[in-house]
Amino acid sequence: MSDTLTRLAQVLEERKGAAADSSYVASLYHKGLNKILEKVGEESVETIIAAKDAAVSGDCSDVIYETADLWFHSMVMLAQLGQHPQAVLDELDRRFGLSGHVEKASRPSA
């Protein structure tokens, strides 16, 4: 895993036990999963809008910025659920070289 993701995961874990007023992340943890999920949804929409704008303008700087926000809040969500980002990277590694059609067919039915 990249050093940046490792360092961020460590900071997110450290902030779990911090006072709500000590940091933005600590305040999210204190507000609970629903607030964190709200932020993930908000950042998802902002990323989509930035991508649509970039397709027209050719400037991807906002896409990068919004994707960073989306990844960040997704990592907060994972940490709140007791998961480490390495689990996501492991899942991507598992899928590497696997046809998307095969991977989708192997998922349990809902």
Curated annotation (Swiss-Prot):
GO terms for molecular function: ATP binding; phosphoribosyl-ATP diphosphatase activity. The keyword ATP-binding applies. It is found in: Cytoplasm. CDD domains: NTP-PPase_HisIE_like. Pfam families: PRA-PH (PF01503). One of its GO terms (biological process) is L-histidine biosynthetic process. Pathway: Amino-acid biosynthesis; L-histidine biosynthesis; L-histidine from 5-phospho-alpha-D-ribose 1-diphosphate: step 2/9. It comes from the Bacteria. Its main location: cytoplasm. InterPro entries: HisE, PRib-ATP_PPHydrolase-like. The keyword Cytoplasm applies. Gene3D superfamilies: MazG-like. One of its GO terms (cellular component) is cytoplasm. It is an enzyme of class 3 (hydrolase). Its EC number is 3.6.1.31. It catalyses: 1-(5-phospho-beta-D-ribosyl)-ATP + H2O = 1-(5-phospho-beta-D-ribosyl)-5'-AMP + diphosphate + H(+). Keywords: Amino-acid biosynthesis, ATP-binding, Cytoplasm, Histidine biosynthesis, Hydrolase, Nucleotide-binding. Belongs to the PRA-PH family. This is Phosphoribosyl-ATP pyrophosphatase. It comes from Pseudomonas fluorescens (strain Pf0-1).
